[in-house]
Amino acid sequence: MTTSTGKINLLGLTQPEMEQFFDSIGEKRFRAGQVMKWIHHFGVDDFAAMTNVGKALREKLEAVAEIRPPEVVSEDISADGTRKWVIRVASGSCVETVYIPTDDRGTLCVSSQAGCALDCSFCSTGKQGFNSNLTAAEVIGQVWLANKSFGTVPAKIDRAITNVVMMGMGEPLLNFDNVIAAMKIMMDDLGYGISKRRVTLSTSGVVPMIDELAKHIDVSLALSLHAPNDELRNQLVPINKKYPLKMLLESCMGYMATLGGKRVLTVEYTLLKDVNDQPEHAAQMIELLRDVPCKINLIPFNPFPHSGYERPSNNAIRRFQDLLHHGGFNVTTRTTRGDDIDAACGQLVGQVNDRTRRSERYIAVRQLSADAELQDSAVRH
């Protein structure tokens, strides 16, 4: 993609695209592999540092291309080791990238949009409205920046980033081409060499793009379910009105069938106090997913200002998990990480230049609600 300088940003080019680029400037295709290794293996963003590339070619590259990662605005480190980067993209908005370390892995949570084109009622990102899709360079640039921060080389066995999840800001399938390109670079040995089983795309349910996915890439799939019936899901995840549960699950199963082996769908379910955490919801979920090869990841709600939702009690969370487990499912409850730096699931907000005015409307509605509560309280007293 050409940047504001009129040059091509090589950071976001897949291997075939990089080869085509070198063809276009009259150079041999093997140069693509050399340059990709410098960019992704060694974190180089200056052609002058590419010591096995001749001076004449380096000068040619300087004239027509660049390696431009997004700008890091800030970095915060949680008490539990979670890291969050605020990154400014070309649109002027800021997005957030989160690194979550555990004993046996390091997971990078990557954003795909500035804001989100969807409006899930319990997610702070959606309340920021929507500005733009990230470019492929801005998506893969989050991996590049994190590796640079850790000073790691992907060829090392002890690398910090072992898994990537497209679960940051935005709906990945509504930025299809750029997300696909970035994931291909993640898995390419000339890029970051991450196993396809360790790259996960999470979607709220854009059915046509799920159907298209298998034609382009083989990655793990996670479904943001959050409700066991259409009536409730229509409220929590409004895209369900367009693609209801039966259609959505058929699409997910169709994609999983193309992967073969023992791959299963990950089902994500944010638990909201007195909304979707009752025994009847667990029973409906067991029935809904009975024939779906899946594992279930329960996510206790992480509060944000004016959300209108609360986190269930620990007893309610355990009860819900136990009911699903007795129903025959592999169930885990996600440990909240990074909440002291607002890096927990559902808390990512960035700084979005909202083109939809959704954020403005959301704040106005919440203010009206707060004013009404104050008036009611005054009347009662």
From Swiss-Prot:
GO molecular function: 4 iron, 4 sulfur cluster binding; metal ion binding; rRNA (adenine(2503)-C2-)-methyltransferase activity; rRNA binding; tRNA (adenine(37)-C2)-methyltransferase activity; tRNA binding
Sections of the chain in a coiled coil: none
EC number: 2.1.1.192
Residues annotated as catalytic: 96 (proton acceptor), 345 (s-methylcysteine intermediate)
Top class in the EC scheme: transferase
Keywords associated with the record: 4Fe-4S, Cytoplasm, Disulfide bond, Iron, Iron-sulfur, Metal-binding, Methyltransferase, rRNA processing, S-adenosyl-L-methionine, Transferase, tRNA processing
PANTHER family found in the cross-reference section: 23S RRNA METHYLTRANSFERASE, RADICAL SAM CORE DOMAIN-CONTAINING PROTEIN
HAMAP family given in the database record: RNA_methyltr_RlmN (MF_01849)
Gene behind this protein: rlmN
A GO BP annotation: rRNA base methylation
GO CC entries: cytoplasm
Protein task: Specifically methylates position 2 of adenine 2503 in 23S rRNA and position 2 of adenine 37 in tRNAs. m2A2503 modification seems to play a crucial role in the proofreading step occurring at the peptidyl transferase center and thus would serve to optimize ribosomal fidelity.
Family: Belongs to the radical SAM superfamily. RlmN family.
Note from the entry: Reaction proceeds by a ping-pong mechanism involving intermediate methylation of a conserved cysteine residue.
CDD domains: Radical_SAM (cd01335)
Catalytic activity line of the entry: adenosine(2503) in 23S rRNA + 2 reduced [2Fe-2S]-[ferredoxin] + 2 S-adenosyl-L-methionine = 2-methyladenosine(2503) in 23S rRNA + 5'-deoxyadenosine + L-methionine + 2 oxidized [2Fe-2S]-[ferredoxin] + S-adenosyl-L-homocysteine; adenosine(37) in tRNA + 2 reduced [2Fe-2S]-[ferredoxin] + 2 S-adenosyl-L-methionine = 2-methyladenosine(37) in tRNA + 5'-deoxyadenosine + L-methionine + 2 oxidized [2Fe-2S]-[ferredoxin] + S-adenosyl-L-homocysteine
One Pfam family it belongs to: Radical_SAM
Protein name, entry field: Dual-specificity RNA methyltransferase RlmN
Cofactor info, note text: Binds 1 [4Fe-4S] cluster. The cluster is coordinated with 3 cysteines and an exchangeable S-adenosyl-L-methionine.
Residue numbers binding S-adenosyl-L-methionine: 170-171, 202, 224-226, 302
Organism the protein comes from: Pseudomonas putida (strain W619)
UniProt: [4Fe-4S] cluster binding residues: 116, 120, 123
Cofactors: [4Fe-4S] cluster
